[in-house]
């Protein structure tokens, strides 16, 4: 083998990423989304169109970035065992950071709920706040999420065992369960008697449940991508890192929702 040909092969298992515009483009698009969201909430921007445009740019850059990642793992073979271990480690740290974010919101909630001062009427929920009843839509959403955890596990085991029919059917059911959850959560928000500006209760309630809602929207996109990849035979029984991280992501969001339901809906009422 000639030296020139031999030099094309790596002597290590790690992926040297080629120059990509997506990290810097995504950073600026997220900055634009944050600024337009803050300006819209404070009334500096009089309409919602700049916010929607920023969100569209973020979704577009994410789509293009995910396209490159799919090409690297499926067609170029860049995701070796060492690379997959690194991805799993990075995703684990991401989950830890998400748990810490929600922990800070629970801290803020209990800080006010366990010792309400005179400005809150010395009661929790504060005077004038009609809390969402835990036996209505929140209970239905809890059942839906628990069911989705079961169906995604069924799908995952089907993929591991090489049963394509079970894997696809379980993933399809999971996708529609999560879509139903998102719609029910939207209906709940549309019918609440308070908003995010109604004191500490409204702020913490919508910050906690709203952040979880945004994660569920992201989960819907991830499930859709995995369904498309599974239909196109991108995933195998031994190589499905994206699908596996999506499964873990769903289970983590299930646990966080159970904590939100117990603390914000059941105990908080």
Swiss-Prot record:
Cellular component GO terms, alphabetical: mitochondrial inner membrane; mitochondrion; respiratory chain complex IV
InterPro entries xrefs: Cyt_c/ubiquinol_Oxase_su3 (IPR024791), Cyt_c_oxase_su3_dom (IPR033945), Cyt_c_oxidase-like_su3 (IPR000298), Cyt_c_oxidase_su3-like_sf (IPR035973), Cyt_c_oxidase_su3_a-hlx (IPR013833)
One Pfam match: COX3
GO biological process: mitochondrial electron transport, cytochrome c to oxygen
Keyword terms of this UniProt record: Membrane, Mitochondrion, Mitochondrion inner membrane, Translocase, Transmembrane, Transmembrane helix
Catalytic activity: 4 Fe(II)-[cytochrome c] + O2 + 8 H(+)(in) = 4 Fe(III)-[cytochrome c] + 2 H2O + 4 H(+)(out)
Transmembrane segments: 21-41, 44-64, 90-110, 138-160, 167-187, 205-225, 248-268
UniProt GO molecular function: cytochrome-c oxidase activity; ubiquinone binding
Subcellular location: Mitochondrion inner membrane
Superkingdom field: Eukaryota
SUPFAM superfamilies for the chain: Cytochrome c oxidase subunit III-like
Membrane topology: Multi-pass membrane protein
The protein's Enzyme Commission number: 7.1.1.9
Family, similarity comment: Belongs to the cytochrome c oxidase subunit 3 family.
Protein function: Component of the cytochrome c oxidase, the last enzyme in the mitochondrial electron transport chain which drives oxidative phosphorylation. The respiratory chain contains 3 multisubunit complexes succinate dehydrogenase (complex II, CII), ubiquinol-cytochrome c oxidoreductase (cytochrome b-c1 complex, complex III, CIII) and cytochrome c oxidase (complex IV, CIV), that cooperate to transfer electrons derived from NADH and succinate to molecular oxygen, creating an electrochemical gradient over the inner membrane that drives transmembrane transport and the ATP synthase.
Stored PANTHER family: CYTOCHROME C OXIDASE SUBUNIT 3, CYTOCHROME C OXIDASE SUBUNIT III
Quaternary structure (record): Component of the cytochrome c oxidase (complex IV, CIV), a multisubunit enzyme composed of a catalytic core of 3 subunits and several supernumerary subunits. The complex exists as a monomer or a dimer and forms supercomplexes (SCs) in the inner mitochondrial membrane with ubiquinol-cytochrome c oxidoreductase (cytochrome b-c1 complex, complex III, CIII).
Protein name as annotated: Cytochrome c oxidase subunit 3
Organism in which the protein naturally occurs: Eremothecium gossypii (strain ATCC 10895 / CBS 109.51 / FGSC 9923 / NRRL Y-1056)
Taxonomic lineage: Eukaryota, Fungi, Dikarya, Ascomycota, Saccharomycotina
